[in-house]
Amino acid sequence: TVLKTDAQCNCEAFKALSLP
């Protein structure tokens, strides 16, 4: 479950970074 949470957090961070 920890890995899943980490992946979700990473996805959000990546999206924020991708945003202008």
Swiss-Prot record:
This is Non-specific lipid-transfer protein-like protein. Belongs to the plant LTP family. It comes from Jatropha curcas (Barbados nut). It comes from the Eukaryota.
